[in-house]
From Swiss-Prot:
HAMAP family: N_acetylneuram_lyase (MF_01237)
Binding residues annotated for aceneuramate, in chain numbering: 47-48, 167, 189, 191-192, 208
Subcellular location(s) of the protein: Cytoplasm
SUBUNIT field: Homotetramer.
Keywords of the record: Carbohydrate metabolism, Cytoplasm, Lyase, Schiff base
Cross-referenced SMART domains: DHDPS (SM01130)
Highest classification ranks of the organism: Bacteria, Pseudomonadati, Pseudomonadota, Gammaproteobacteria, Enterobacterales
The gene coding this protein: nanA2
Name of the protein in question: N-acetylneuraminate lyase 2
Catalysis: reaction(s): aceneuramate = aldehydo-N-acetyl-D-mannosamine + pyruvate
Chief location category: cytoplasm
Gene Ontology biological-process annotations: carbohydrate metabolic process; N-acetylneuraminate catabolic process
Length: 305
């Protein structure tokens, strides 16, 4: 199945209030901030969105709110994955109801499912989505599910699978997948190797740090498209300096703290068992947020974004 969703797609965080309840006002502001950055698509309800710390009703409400706020301005991919096929089917139906362009699902994890069981799981979700294309989400480091290249080749040929989100540092495998399936849309998942992933054959990326500096990833995407490897490397290094700071503070909490300091969300809260950023890291993040927001404003005034 052909899929045209290429380029830079933000993996959307879920803002919470101080009671760890979903903050829909902040969610809407975050969507608008992505649009300001000239981001054209959102990946909703994935790892960055803390989906596995939410119940099905909450996940469905997020899908509804994002669709409402986006109002046709963005390509929307609904991550509906989880351990339970039945719950994923419910969310796939919701994605169809709210007008999403595609669904996505991580491989079911925790239990040692067979490859055949994984394939059945995906087919059932796809059938529930009533014609929506599927983006398979492969993230072996967190799911614990490690498919061979032959298994990936089989998985992406399931009817209505149109894309693969490949969150892996194995660039050789990424190149092999693209060579074997040139029609498949391939997304790079690790933000820190976005430029390298594009060179290896990715058609775009889905990432969490796009929310705080999406314009940089757009520059990388354009640079690689124009064969300007030096520019792409320069911008990737700039992104990786931010990512290095986030790793030291905790990536998800760090991203939310930056968004909080930038005035985009009302609190930097993640759901338990995630911890808040330690006080010793706050000053560094505050100064980084100021620099990023100033850079965003400059780009906006220069109409770069």
């Amino acid at each position: 199945m052909q899929c045209e969703f290429k380029g830079v797609i933000s993996a959307l965080p879920t803002p919470y209030d101080q009671s760890q309840q979903i903050d829909m006002e902040s969610l809407r502001k975050l969507i608008r901030f992505n649009i300001e950055q000239n981001i054209k698509g959102l990946y909703v309800g994935g790892s960055t969105g803390e989906a596995f710390l939410q119940n099905v009703a909450e996940r469905e409400k997020i899908l509804e709110t994002v669709a409402d706020e986006s109002d046709g301005r963005l390509t929307l991919i609904a991550h509906v994955g989880g351990i339970s096929t039945a719950e994923s089917e419910v969310l796939a139906k919701a994605a169809k109801k709210y007008g999403y362009h595609a669904i996505s699902a991580v491989t079911p994890f925790y239990y040692p499912f067979s490859f055949e069981e994984h394939c059945i799981h995906y087919r059932k979700i796809i059938d529930s989505a009533d014609g929506l294309p599927m983006v398979v989400y492969n993230i072996p480091a967190l799911s614990g599910v490690r498919f061979s290249l032959d298994q990936i080749n089989e998985l992406v040929t399931i009817p209505r699978v149109c894309a693969l989100k490949q969150t892996s540092g194995d660039l050789f495998q990424m190149e092999q997948i693209k060579r074997n399936h040139p029609e498949l849309v391939l997304y790079n998942g690790y933000d820190e190797i976005f430029a390298s992933g594009l060179i290896a054959g990715a058609d775009g990326g889905i990432g969490s740090t796009y929310n705080i500096m999406g314009w940089r990833y757009l520059e990388i995407f354009e640079a690689v498209k124009n064969n300007d490897v030096i520019k792409a490397k320069e911008m990737q290094v700039a992104c990786n300096q931010v990512i290095d700071t986030l790793i030291q503070s905790g990536v998800l909490a760090g991203i939310k703290t930056l968004l909080y300091y930038m005035g985009i969300i009302n609190t930097p809260v993640c759901r338990s068992p995630f911890s808040p950023v330690k006080e010793k890291n706050l000053d560094v993040l505050s100064k980084l947020a100021e620099r990023l927001f100033e850079e965003h404003d400059r780009n906006k005034k220069m109409k770069i974004i």
